């Protein structure tokens, strides 16, 4: 347990804005496109929707004009398919919104008088993939001008295929990730004293230990700061995702092999992973399965947004390599809830944190290969490109030569950077930048 992670305010997740996502949504509000929040369960999509509702009301939108459906609530259990969804929305706006729990408290309060909606209307649907054929209702909402639509979902494959089928060119996807370290610090500051403040370097370093240990799910900030409590919560979140979004959805018969695969993936964060390598490992453990089964299981885990895969890129040949992707976790806290926190895994964990930070900043990420040497990350966004090496420490000449030397082999003029936990290392070496990891994360 890290003692300074106290619990002075338990409602933290409900009042800290995640401005990155609010700005992305608001850029498309009142535009004829569906706003799609895609992210793993418990990354905060529901809270983002509630914050959006608050902003709409602050702009003068009546609560009667806002329909919020959360499919994790039994209140909406009767909405089984697209027909139910469409009828519910039409009835809601036609006959009045004062029917109880169809929206957050602020909306139902604003809609206290039964009245039909007048003016622009808004439809927000949480965990939309739980409604069969939902895309048909959403397409009809657009065609009929019934309302401005925001939806969220936690299955990448399901959302992508259904959006492409009926809503091609009429939606914008906004990925939602666990808290970045900067967001984590905002939550922690608000929890301590209800507002933003300047953190000392020592405080930032201590909070980074919390972040490294517990990850970035917003829900951890509502719980007592004890390992047994937080790791139990994280393990419960992981089990919900695995059994609801993977085992049940895909009708996996041998849950034991699937569980062992998940443990293998979580245990090899930041390592090159292939189905053949996993199958060979299982064989050595006298576990019988096939490469095809492993491939299917990995695709299911990836679709649940628990993991990401980064392809390898031949820098000299300028082509993606077909095999040997690296696996990264959406949230390292879930890993520690499953297999515990281990100091010896620090390099892979730091790589994972930088990978997720780059993702949150909008970069497309691959793993570089040059002269059979590896570059941890190639991060690309529009015309911008960065080459990045990540390590725990640069305490030896061998480490310095390895991290900087690999980058020196790349002869283009794009930015090259080594990120480490060395706070006082020189700012550059032979034109290659060095950044202290915590400073990089707080930029």
Outline where the language-model segments fall.
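Accessory nucleic acid-recognition modules appended to NTPase machines
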Residues: 225-384
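Pre-Walker A adenine-sensing motif
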Residues: 12-29
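Hydrophobic anchor at the beta1->P-loop junction of P-loop NTPases
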Residues: 37
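Conserved lysine of the Walker
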Residues: 45
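Hydrophobic positions on the alpha1 helix immediately C-terminal to the Walker A/P-loop
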Residues: 48, 52
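Interdomain motor-coupling "hinge/lid" segment immediately C-terminal to the ATP-binding subdomain
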Residues: 2, 154-156, 161-272
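Catalytic cores of nucleic-acid endonucleases
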Residues: 368, 392-438
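Short glycine-rich substrate-engagement loop in P-loop NTPases that contacts/grips substrate
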Residues: 68-100, 118-119
